[in-house]
UniProtKB/Swiss-Prot annotation:
Chain sites annotated for binding heme b: H63, H92
InterPro entries given in the database record: Globin, Globin-like_sf, Globin/Proto, Hemoglobin_b, Hemoglobin_oxygen_transport
Pfam families recorded: Globin
GO terms, biological process: hydrogen peroxide catabolic process
Protein name: Hemoglobin subunit beta
Length: 146
């Protein structure tokens, strides 16, 4: 993947300003509320039987933060994202049996949450760079499935 200077700077800027403890939980809770079939991966997280329960579930919130911190690895290794996520791809494919399309659903929800936080600063150019980054990460996470 070729990255322009603007794309690199944009991705690094977004993640350097991101409040992981807010954006991560908001992203994962949005994902499991909008796409309820994704809840099957989180059954061990306790009460997730309603929107209110999901919004108040500390394990969902914690895992959302963990997911977001996992994206840091991609930000720090933008020139080698595929290898950066090879182990996680294998884990999600072989052990957790996560449908790889769910990575895209999560990235779509992350885009919505980030856009809401950034407001007018989330221009078309910024969104294009952000979604390009997420697309490369999603493809890398799904790599083990092929």
């Amino acid at each position: 993947v070729e990255w322009t200077d603007f794309e690199r700077a944009t991705i690094q800027d977004i993640f350097s300003k991101m409040d992981y403890e807010t954006v991560g939980p908001a992203t994962l809770t949005r994902t499991v509320i909008v796409y309820p079939w994704t809840l099957r991966y989180f059954a061990k997280f306790g009460n997730i039987c309603s929107t209110a329960a999901i919004l108040g579930n500390k394990e969902i919130a914690k895992h959302g933060t963990t997911i977001l911190h996992g994206l840091d690895r991609g930000v720090k290794n933008m020139d080698d994202i595929k290898n950066t996520y090879a182990e996680l791809s294998k884990l999600h494919s072989e052990k957790l049996h996560v449908d790889p399309d769910n990575f895209r659903l999560l990235s779509d929800c992350l885009t919505i949450v980030v856009a809401a936080k950034m407001g007018k600063d989330f221009t078309g150019e910024v969104q294009a760079a952000f979604q390009k980054f997420l697309s490369v990460v999603v493809n890398s996470l799904g790599r083990q499935y092929h």
